From Swiss-Prot:
Its main location: cytoplasm. One of its GO terms (cellular component) is cytoplasm. This is Chaperonin GroEL 1. Belongs to the chaperonin (HSP60) family. Its EC number is 5.6.1.7. ATP binds at residues 30-33, 51, 87-91, 415, 496.
Length: 547
């Protein structure tokens, strides 16, 4: 086991504080509408330019191991806030730095770190309660656009795009962000259910120009297993031919005689038919087939349910107004499923999302939910260069996360005003234990940190801004750093999601109070370099080899 280096009390805290400051100072320059960019070297390709706090935090690695530990703890704040709220990482970092700095001073002055921690927790609980009380529900599409715009650093088109996407796919819908090949940033909305399986044979194509299969008012046969023999399919095929409607077959696979017969029927014009493989794998495939069955008002043909293909009638088939299939995707639009059944399925999937502990499973369940409940929107981010596209994509993702958070818990005045106004709630708390009271006062002072930083990044003195806002008794009065004016933040549309503000403070105080109570730090001693190999002597006597 390698030897360790151990630092204690003041020495440990000083080193840790230096690390916290390096990381926080690199991150906090990005805060607010006039925040600057950070340029990050990449071992491959062009450097990356970003205004995203968590992206900067993840890149900071310090040489001194003790300083690095402090930096890593604050990086944890940014990552946790990003995971929970998806935005507010820079605010969380600024708050953590402020709490650690003040806490370290208090410990150096001889106060009890555990009492300080208790004071910090009491104050944070009061602030969270205050923020939740002030939060105003998001009602209109315009308010969603405002949240998106603020989070995308004042980029109004991005805010509008997110509002448009959320309006179309609903709050349950899935919105993904991708890079676009062109200069434009655009929204692509897929209505209905889309899954990533294309036609099994190009002979099914009905639109030769677009190479797609288009079926109007189609029947849909959903089968859990492979279809290879023809005999069992004949009764249902004959019934569909008599109805004169097209047919889509979704099964684990369609092969051999079954596929050949379908192709021949299609070419002869007897039956307008197409076949695709079922989406997903294993248990997930079965669940997705059941989703499609509910959406289209059909039944999944499964031997578990005792239904055989030979006994299938038209009533068991799903129906859809339109089905479009290309080489890679199938889209089912306007399925004939009953609304109460779809809603019951949606509730069931929501319950599974609550229960699952796996991020991957949660993501897949969320996708299934979106396909049933709303739809899928893709925001394609464009730009002149790869560096610009990546920077813009960071901002779009932040804005998207912020709008989702706003829909969940409502909005509060932005620009650090909500935290500053919460000072009143903390000011009412008093504690007989002077060290606990000192912990409460640490949070009281830290609540000013975000608004001071926003002002300083805009080139304005932070103390003056804080003083002016606190003088004014209007709760929503604040400082617009973009125009450098004092305005009503809600009226001007400068808002933050309550969830983002709350999460930023809770995560910052949680990690910062742990750092304040640190009394010793242990790190591995750097290994001494191994001595170099001696020069290759002793190879004499080779002179006669004629070289």
């Amino acid at each position: 086991m390698a030897a360790k280096d151990v630092k204690f009390s003041g020495d440990a805290r000083d080193r840790m504080l230096r690390g916290v400051d390096v990381l926080a100072n690199a991150v906090k320059v990005t805060l607010g509408p006039k925040g600057r960019n950070v340029l990050i070297e990449k071992s491959f390709g062009a450097p990356r330019i970003t205004k995203d706090g968590v992206t900067v935090a993840k890149e900071v690695e310090l040489e001194d191991k003790f300083e690095n530990m402090g930096a890593q703890m604050v990086r944890e704040v940014a990552s946790k806030t990003n995971d929970l709220a998806g935005d507010g990482t820079t605010t969380a970092t600024v708050l953590a730095q402020a709490i650690v700095r003040e806490g370290a001073k208090a410990v150096a002055a001889g106060m009890n770190p555990m009492d300080l921690k208790r004071g910090i927790e009491i104050a944070v609980a009061a602030v969270v309660k205050d923020i939740q009380k002030r939060a105003k529900p998001v009602a209109s599409s315009a308010e969603i656009a405002q949240v998106g715009t603020i989070s995308a650093n004042g980029d109004a088109p991005i805010g509008k795009m997110i509002a448009q996407a959320m309006q179309k796919v609903g709050n349950e819908g899935v919105i993904t962000v991708e890079e676009n090949k062109s200069l434009e940033t655009e929204v692509d909305i897929v209505e209905g259910m889309k899954f990533d399986r294309g036609y099994l044979s190009p002979y099914f194509v009905t639109n030769a120009e677009k190479m797609t299969v288009e079926l109007d008012d189609a029947y849909i046969l959903l089968h859990e297993k492979k279809l290879s023999g023809l005999q069992s399919m004949l009764p249902v095929l004959e019934a569909v031919v008599q109805s004169g409607k097209p047919l889509l077959i979704i099964a684990e696979d369609v092969e051999g005689e079954a596929l050949a017969t379908l192709v021949v029927n299609r070419l002869r014009g007897g039956l307008k038919v197409s076949a695709v493989k079922a989406p997903g794998f294993g248990d997930r495939r079965k669940a997705m087939l059941e989703d499609i069955a509910i959406l289209t008002g059909g039944q999944l043909i499964s031997e578990d349910l005792g239904i055989k293909l030979e006994t299938v009638t038209l009533k068991m088939l799903g129906r859809a107004k339109k089905v479009v299939i290309d080489k890679e995707n199938t889209t089912i639009v306007n399925g004939a499923g009953k609304k109460p059944e779809i809603e019951a399925r949606v509730s069931q999937i929501k319950a599974q999302i609550e229960e699952t502990s796996s991020d991957y499973d949660r993501e897949k369940l969320q996708e299934r939910l979106a396909k049933l409940a709303g739809g899928v929107a893709v925001i394609r981010v464009g730009g002149a260069t790869e560096v610009e596209v990546k920077e813009k994509k960071d901002r779009v993702e932040d804005a998207l996360n912020a709008t989702r958070a706003a829909v969940q818990e409502g909005i509060v005045p932005g620009g650090g005003v909500a935290l500053l106004r919460a000072k009143k709630a903390v000011g009412r708390i008093s504690n007989d234990n002077p060290d606990v009271q000192a912990g409460i006062n640490i949070v009281l002072k830290a609540l000013e940190a975000p608004i001071r930083q926003i002002a300083e990044n805009a080139g304005v003195e932070g103390s003056i801004v804080v003083g002016k806002i606190l003088e004014n008794k209007t709760e929503t009065f604040g400082f617009d750093a973009q125009t450098e004016e004092y305005v009503d933040m809600l009226a001007k549309g400068i808002v933050d999601p309550a969830k983002v503000v709350r999460t930023a403070l809770q995560d910052a105080s949680s990690v910062a109070s742990l750092l304040v109570t640190t009394e010793a730090m242990v790190a591995e001693l750097p290994k001494a370099d191994a001595p170099a190999m001696p020069a290759g002597g002793g190879m004499g006597g080779m002179g006669g080899m004629g070289f």
